Design a protein with these regions (language model features):
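Conserved beta-strand hairpin/beta-sheet module of binuclear metal-dependent hydrolase folds
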Residues: 18-69, 179-196
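Core dinuclear metal-dependent hydrolase active-site scaffold
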Residues: 41-42, 152-185
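Pre-active-site segment of Zn-dependent metallo-hydrolases
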Residues: 49-79, 123, 140-143, 148-149
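Active-site neighborhood of phospho(di)ester-bond hydrolases with catalytic His/Asp-centered motifs
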Residues: 51-54, 77-84, 103-106, 169-172, ...
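Active-site environment of divalent metal-dependent phosphoester hydrolases
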Residues: 56-58, 84-89, 112-113, 175-177, ...
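Active-site metal-binding motif and surrounding structural segment of the metallo-beta-lactamase
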Residues: 59-105, 109, 232
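Divalent-metal (often Zn2+) His-rich catalytic cores of metallo-beta-lactamase-fold enzymes
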Residues: 97, 158, 181-182, 188-190, ...
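Metallo-beta-lactamase
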Residues: 110-168, 213, 217-229
Length: 258
């Protein structure tokens, strides 16, 4: 199976290495966050959808983006979290309180979002980092509070947002780690690959072992993602907002060339 963006090539307007926008007809993808970890605001005439909520700076970016677009906060109806690590959920409660959005996450990562997970073995390193992140957040006056989870992601489901987002459960990094595949005509096949891999000019790599719950399962999931043969990919950790570039990097990584 090969998924791609068809004949409609995205128009990329770069605002620098850590930000940007893709246009697919009247639909858009806005990158929020920064070079360390990104969230993505999906925009079309039907409403707004946020994929992941980054850390504590993202809620302010969301508010500014919505205002710049001339949209209302109530139009941000869905927040889809690819998995429950703190760098993807840190702003969820604040964004939910501001917009009233429903929050989606896979059932297997509910305890991650609620910060009730017990990290074991080598993955304890992730727990230590998240503890440090919460301490830094409190020092900045931003105590982590979990959002109210309103819906669960399931493998194969088609989310009724942005023309349709197909859920692909890719466990390993976390038990409930998911990717999302766009099915709208203009952007069919654009994959939001979450933390399946990181993509930078200086390094294209799998998530560090101490951030991954099950490395064997994560490798199976990475290969399952590559087997889709996507032509357009946006990871959560990347440099340039160039989906075709990240698709090529993914193929090279799994093929053994990176």
């Amino acid at each position: 199976m090969r998924v791609g963006i068809g004949r409609t090539r995205p128009v990329v307007a770069r605002w620098g290495m850590a930000s940007g926008e893709l246009k697919f007809g009247s639909a858009r993808v806005l990158r929020l966050g920064g070079g360390l970890v990104s969230a993505h605001l999906l925009v079309d005439d039907a409403g707004l959808t946020l994929i992941d909520t980054g850390l504590w700076g993202v809620p302010g970016q969301v508010r500014r983006a919505v205002a710049r677009l001339g949209r209302r906060r109530e139009e941000l109806r869905e927040v889809v979290m690819t998995h429950g690590h703190l760098d993807h959920t840190g702003g969820a409660a604040e964004i939910q309180a501001w917009s009233g959005a429903r929050v989606w996450v896979h059932a297997a990562d509910r305890d991650h979002v609620e910060q009730a997970v017990e990290y074991r073995g080598l993955a304890r390193g992730c727990g230590w980092l998240e503890t440090a992140g919460r301490v830094v957040g409190r020092a900045q006056g931003r105590t982590y509070c979990p959002p109210v989870i309103g819906a669960e992601l399931r493998d194969g489901d088609l989310l009724p947002v942005w023309g349709g987002l197909r859920v692909r459960h890719l466990p390993g990094h976390t038990p409930g780690h998911c990717a999302l595949v766009a099915e709208r005509r203009e952007a069919c096949g654009l994959v939001f690959s979450a933390d399946s891999f990181a993509s930078y000019g200086w390094s294209v790599h799998r998530p560090p072992w101490f951030l991954t719950r099950d490395r064997v399962e994560a490798e199976r999931s990475l290969r399952a993602l590559a087997e889709l043969r996507p032509e357009a990919v946006l990871p959560s950790h990347y440099d340039r907002m160039d989906p075709a570039l990240h698709a090529r990097r993914l193929a090279k990584l799994v093929g053994g060339g990176a």
